[in-house]
Regions:
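Short beta-strand/loop segment that forms part of the nucleotide-sugar
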Residues: 36-45, 63-66
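Conserved nucleotide-sugar donor-binding catalytic segment
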Residues: 119, 137-227
Length: 318
């Protein structure tokens, strides 16, 4: 594939008052070995140094106006972008692997049945020190592909890493612009993952650490994120998760997998034994998750519970 034949990748970057990280994030994109890029910054009306930093990059497209959070910013970026593939990049996070975009485009062209490519994420302290993987489960084993990732989502309910996933624009538009979220400040990526799997699209994972997710002072603490993100959003995206679980476990109708054009590329049918094993895994995962939520809620009152919180985080891969 010559540089002239490379499909355009649109990098959509939501931003708000995190200018101290903007240069590092943008430079990480510009240093990619893949050069057929369009960078779109959707800024929510920052009042810090963000716009001054962005002014040093005349080649990027910047829109700065009030919005209701990352979900609205992403929707806005999708409506104006021109790329065949989409990469979402939060302004406080960045890419670690300089050939990541090239690897993803090659993977998606090699596997036309797949609609999304993603990789691992390592947390990054505000000091710049790299920490553990964002999902501890993948410290022990490589993430699965295609039907295996669908099963993993059904079991654990966790999504793709939004800081490095590259999606076919057609699929991103179909899913994201169909959302009717009760509050556009909600975490759009949990809804995206649920809708992606419910519609039958499949993904590919390149099992390398591709990006980092920064832990900073403006970010919600783990306690707040866990309580809010994993349980308050349950009314919408976990309801969809349980609906698909019931479909797979209780009906004989197979779950179909489709490509970005809607063509069927596979089916998932489980034997009675496999359904029973799968059900036990779901029950264990859900029980551990709810127990961890209870411990997180109580740990400030009972310091000893901190030990058990850390244990259960490891046991469920959070």
């Amino acid at each position: 594939m010559t540089p002239q034949d490379r499909p355009l990748v649109s990098v959509i970057v939501p931003s708000f008052n995190l200018g101290r990280y903007a240069k590092e994030t943008i430079d990480g994109v510009l240093m990619q070995t893949y050069n057929s890029l369009e960078i779109i910054i959707i800024d929510g009306g920052s009042t810090d140094e963000t716009l001054a930093v962005l002014a040093n990059y005349p080649s990027i497209h910047v829109i700065s106006e009030f919005d209701n959070g990352p979900a609205e910013a992403i929707m806005k970026g999708l409506r104006i972008c021109s790329g065949e593939f989409i990469l979402f990049q939060l302004i406080s996070d960045g890419l670690l692997e300089p050939s990541w975009i090239s690897k993803c485009v090659n993977e998606l062209q090699k596997h036309p049945e797949a609609s999304l490519c993603w990789g691992l994420v390592r947390r990054k302290e505000e000091s710049g020190e790299l920490a553990e993987l964002a999902l501890l489960r993948w410290e022990k084993t490589d993430p699965p592909n295609e039907a295996g990732m669908f099963i993993s989502w059904l079991t654990y309910g966790s999504g793709f890493h939004e800081t490095n996933m590259i999606i076919r624009k057609k699929v991103a538009l179909e899913i994201v612009l169909s959302f009717n979220l009760p509050n556009s400040k909600d975490d759009i990526f949990y809804y995206f993952t649920a809708e992606f799997h419910a519609r039958g699209y499949i993904s590919r994972c390149i099992p390398i650490v591709a990006s980092y997710s920064r832990i900073h002072s403006n970010q919600r603490s783990f306690d707040e994120m866990f309580n809010k993100k994993l349980f308050n959003y349950e009314k919408i995206w976990r309801r969809k998760l349980w609906r698909i679980r019931r479909k797979v476990l209780l009906t004989t109708k197979p779950h179909r997998f489709i490509d970005s054009n809607g063509a069927i590329v596979g089916m998932l049918e489980l034997s009675i034994k496999s359904r029973a094993i799968f059900l036990v895994k779901i029950i264990l995962s859900s029980t551990r998750l709810r127990l961890l939520n209870l411990m997180v809620t109580c740990k400030r009152r009972i310091p000893l519970l901190r030990i058990f919180v850390n244990y259960f985080r490891l046991s469920i891969g959070r």
